[in-house]
Amino acid sequence: MLPAVGSADEEEDPAEEDCPELVPMETTQSEEEEKSGLGAKIPVTIITGYLGAGKTTLLNYILTEQHSKRVAVILNEFGEGSALEKSLAVSQGGELYEEWLELRNGCLCCSVKDNGLRAIENLMQKKGKFDYILLETTGLADPGAVASMFWVDAELGSDIYLDGIITIVDSKYGLKHLAEEKPDGLINEATRQVALADAILINKTDLVPEEDVKKLRATIRSINGLGQILETQRSRVDLSNVLDLHAFDSLSGISLQKKLQHVPGTQPHLDQSIVTITFEVPGNAKEEHLNMFIQNLLWEKNVRNKDNHCMEVIRLKGLVSIKDKSQQVIVQGVHELYDLEETPVSWKDDTERTNRLVLLGRNLDKDILKQLFIATVTETEKQWTTHFKEDQVCT
């Protein structure tokens, strides 16, 4: 496990290092309902944040609240001396799963090594015993890389879906972590975790002055203009704000439409160049041109701003109108992956079709990005070469 960042007093409490103490939950699910659930996709929520921020406390809280969910917990790595390491091998169906621990209420804990795919695939062999997965990452993990694996593996995608990314920020050390400078101009881990989040929990607010919480909140909002920000103590939060968000699927289309109308553009704080930009362009987009627009941002990484700095998109989200399609289409991009999916919402005949996009990233220029997007809508390609060229790929 990677070492904690910061001083010794940032270490996790002992309770933070151990697997959550789980209590038995009554279930009234019938055998028929359980069988029918075997074919249903299971949501996965990624919980991320620096060591000591309160990730395991949140897990503990979720698992001991009354919500009638049967939850499987995936721990990215077991901490040294963790109580889990005392009993990692369990017998299931005559086979030995060395990395799995089945707890007394039927919930599961496991250690995810390498890219985590094998562990999750093994977990899916136990499908029917749980209906929700919580995945806790290490403190320095990039949640974008973790989220990407749910899109890359088609077989895995038939069993599960990514529901949302929750980032927990320590009220006392959050500003310090967000301001940390990395070599070669890289984005630090804390900033990337905040930028990718669907919900950000500012935790331990009772341990710092209110003014410090306000500064931290403003900094977080400057990085992520779309995610919900919640202030918590001991990671206690209304579970409807962190579970069943449907942040990455077509069911989020209706709520996303309202949310995108009120997303503010942001300015960088703490000398960071991470911002949220949003724009709207009326009309229809040709799907192949829209793919070209997104691929140049996420794959080719050859789009530059007015200062000739590379634009780096960390997360992309929006609702678009695709030519010859009656349904609104949601676009999602994380890391170097993206997806277009039709929503259940149709465009009304008496309303103007439009495209709303929100991009979170570094060195983003709203005017240039909007200009490039307009090229996909108007189907004119003369503007495309203005700010990206094949011989100017960002490295």
From Swiss-Prot:
Q: Does the keyword Chaperone apply?
A: yes
Q: Which Pfam families match?
A: cobW, CobW_C
**Binding positions for Zn(2+) per the UniProt entry:** 107, 109-110
The segment annotated Disordered runs over 1-36
CDD domains of this UniProt entry? Answer: CobW-like
* UniProt keyword terms in alphabetical order: Chaperone, GTP-binding, Hydrolase, Metal-binding, Nucleotide-binding, Nucleus, Zinc
Locate the motif CXCC motif: 107-110
- Domain CobW C-terminal residues, every copy: 274-377
* Official protein name in the record: Zinc-regulated GTPase metalloprotein activator 1B
Which species is this UniProt entry from?
Homo sapiens
